[in-house]
């Protein structure tokens, strides 16, 4: 396995001849993920409930299980109700309502379209709950996600980034050549996980950087 590089540190613009496939994370690359903003929109008149939902739902112990595909929203809402006391309906509102208030990150979509124009294969690699992923990709933003050629999502393979297994599943499922692939993620440890498995990385850590890179 050849040594992987961080493209955002090595190059000012995309080295198109160096890659055949570009892999995109979803949250904060293509779709905004900002739980503190979501709870304000979902529970606008109750600051305490906003804080509790942020801690109990988005920052709570069950969230990795949603991503891994081992726990559904209905079951989780009941568990949260029994543990913390808010109504089941409140937890379901927090678990499902955020999907309706997540806006696209246009910078990420411009990058994806540019990659497609350059003849590159496009894939997804994301930690995502099944219900949320299917709502975004098959309903709310179905036309946008149609540009992708496939990918690996945590809820289906039951691995979460940055576990090695999810990158190996991506390579296998999408028939990737790691040294000809770059992965874009907003979380550095996930980028480093890809690089550990031979895939080049790109850490999206500030607004505007993808517009400058994918020109």
Enumerate the language-model features and the residues they cover.
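A metal-dependent, Asp-based hydrolase signature
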Residues: 63-94
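Short catalytic/ligand-binding loop motif for oxyanion handling, primarily in non-cytosolic enzymes
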Residues: 30-33, 39, 118, 131-135, ...
């Amino acid at each position: 396995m050849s040594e992987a590089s961080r493209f955002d540190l090595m190059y000012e613009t995309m080295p198109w001849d160096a890659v055949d496939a570009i892999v995109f994370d979803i949250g904060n690359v293509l779709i905004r993920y900002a739980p503190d903003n979501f709870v304000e929109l979902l529970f606008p008149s109750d600051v305490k409930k906003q804080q509790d939902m942020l801690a109990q739902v988005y920052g709570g112990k069950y969230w990795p299980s949603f991503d891994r595909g081992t726990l559904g929203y209905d079951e989780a809402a009941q568990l949260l109700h029994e543990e913390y006391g808010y109504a089941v309906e409140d937890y379901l509102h927090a678990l499902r309502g955020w999907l309706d208030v997540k806006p696209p990150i246009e910078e990420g979509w411009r990058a994806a379209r540019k990659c497609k124009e350059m003849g590159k294969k496009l894939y997804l690699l994301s930690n995502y709950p099944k219900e949320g992923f299917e709502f975004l990709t098959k309903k709310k933003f179905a036309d946008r996600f149609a540009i992708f050629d496939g990918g690996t999502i945590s809820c289906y393979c039951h691995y979460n980034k940055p576990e090695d297994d999810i990158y190996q599943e991506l390579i296998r499922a999408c028939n990737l050549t790691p040294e000809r692939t770059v992965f874009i993620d907003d979380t550095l440890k996930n980028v480093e996980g890809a690089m550990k498995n031979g895939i080049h990385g790109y850490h999206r850590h500030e607004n505007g950087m993808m517009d400058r890179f994918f020109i």
